[in-house]
């Protein structure tokens, strides 16, 4: 038996080596990404064509005679004065201060793709009315708010105003470009030259051109319009060039954010003269930092901020997209009738944003704020809010590629107990499956998965197993056979099943754009279909960009065919969302709709927040990768994806102990907290480090678990209101210009400010404490600091600089146990940090931690705590909720308080009772011991 096992082990190692060699050939493995494997704008024919068009007068003219105003929208035809092709513009005023703009061909040869399943519902209409008109413009008034839209006919332009203040302009730079569908030109030949060959672009209006001067110029087809080649991959384009582009001008705006995912600073940079930001979901091996290259996910939402206003642009398009950003100075006056609406004179800074997508229609939502909280709610009303996760998923996750077998998993589980370290979840990567056949278990290494799961369940722990969306092509493998027989794979352009190369070798790719496919996939997670699964097994969807090792840019051919006859180029960026959606639906359905799912996915799109968590992908054990996780997760939170984290310790390479310690300290204060590592790295169980490092990691884990009631409440607030959990400082302090570019520290909710230590050998950090007239308390020493100021804070290896804002109340669990489920009924301690005015407030959300009963049966508690006038009051913040719980208030810690003569507790129906207390005059901390009141009850505590 030993010899058989040894042979099997050698075969597994040989296969792993073969895959790595293959990856080295396909991906050009080096110490960093091989950029030549991924397109630049110059190598993307549609981006090159779009970008070749320079600002000037637009060739499009709105035909005002065609204008029709209905109860839901206004439509008007746009005429290209060179090609004479007609487009149709549809304008909608929406409730909650939003506007929608859609542009499509009036008579397309073939319908263009309109992105489904991202919007949670048709947004309610705020009717438009015509309030003014002349020969070249129409003034529209929105039914809600002081908003007007000026539609200028020639050249076509839209200006959106609030009263007399210009908020933004559409096509002010004349960069609207809509490549209409056409028949192939016979003279062109069967193939176009490869992209990037230096051919001249078609003639379009340039600076100073008049639209009529371009009339009569022949319309040409660019190289790459009908077929293009990248490296060895040929992309047929049977429908020809279909790209769309449009510009937006934002006067008064110098700071813009969003459009993740990029490994870059929080504030977006000017791209003119360089590469635009690219949105195209890709498996990028060992990605570089501080550049606009595409990564695993795409959310086409851009936010603009200044001290007085916030705006958002949501570009609803699932095709490959590039975004150019430029900084200009714009006059406050405009031609024609616009002068009547504007105030002042002179110049103002302006940011111009240009969107360019390969296919689809132009479908854009303008989110008009006026505050950033309003913008968050507006976007959430369109695409939904962050799913409320099960409580366990907010604990610590231990993962690597791969734990060898059942004994290894249970040994890791035992390691946490033996070393008094909390942990909620252990993860299994691709090696757990039988030959990487997902929904199976390797019979030699995981022969009794259900027994293993039961052992973990007895410790109140969970297991996450990877289920990737590529299926091994293997006759006799039930998953493959059913998908092939049902015709549910993505097809090639000739109608056969598309096959690519991934972890199992030759693999088919399920067509998740097909609702039938998604239903089939969801059903696979039933306990009957997923043999060996149990209620404490959850799922990880990796590689869902989709990743195709031998495909162009490590992804699928763009001319692959999907449900409904759409090409992959139309749907690429939404594919990962559909995988995430179907998996989350499956976990929900397996419990009869009772249990909340937990699914981690790598690729994402607008709306992915409804289905679970994401992470920043395959990072590296380097200090700069530790740093970059902050702006990466901040950017994701700004566009709705709050459940974000980075692989603690770095996926590639072996971290030095100091780096690993600092990463645990940071991870403890990020929404998703998972350690993960590559197959070739050393084991990283915290107990394997020297004791001095292990002790510090234990403390970081303890801080995470102590704050779980606070984290859970933040997630409920994000779920309810759409506000991010991990926030840039400017979100809370919108008028403080100093905060606008800070991305090495952040807020959790409005209560905690975190400045991780992210430099090797650091002896101190510079912390900016914002807020005029506010105070901040170090959560360890309780030392008080006044804002605004930049504070030099000395640090040791055990330091995690965290401050609680005066005026907030943070709930904690003070008994750290082996998992969150072991703590869920523990008593609560309230940390009350007083403002200079002697006030504070906070919330606490509680439910059963795992079902949808909070939603379907209103079984929850939302308590509001308010301290004012030396009295702390607990009341219900949502009377519709009801939930019986044994949790009680164990202590109240009041920071910044004087010593009272007495402390009195009042509860309804009971006489007053005195509480024991202890006051520390050096720290001004007052501790009230054992009020002993149920957290669900109304009560007040008076300091006398």
From Swiss-Prot:
Pathway: Glycan metabolism; N-glycan metabolism
Basic and acidic residues bias: start-end ranges: 203-236
Protein location: Endoplasmic reticulum; Golgi apparatus; Melanosome
Pfam family, one: Gal_mutarotas_2
Mod. after translation: Contains sialylated polysaccharide chains.
Cross-referenced Gene3D superfamilies: Glycosidases, glycosyl hydrolase (family 31), Golgi alpha-mannosidase II
Protein name: Neutral alpha-glucosidase AB
Organism of derivation: Macaca fascicularis (Crab-eating macaque)
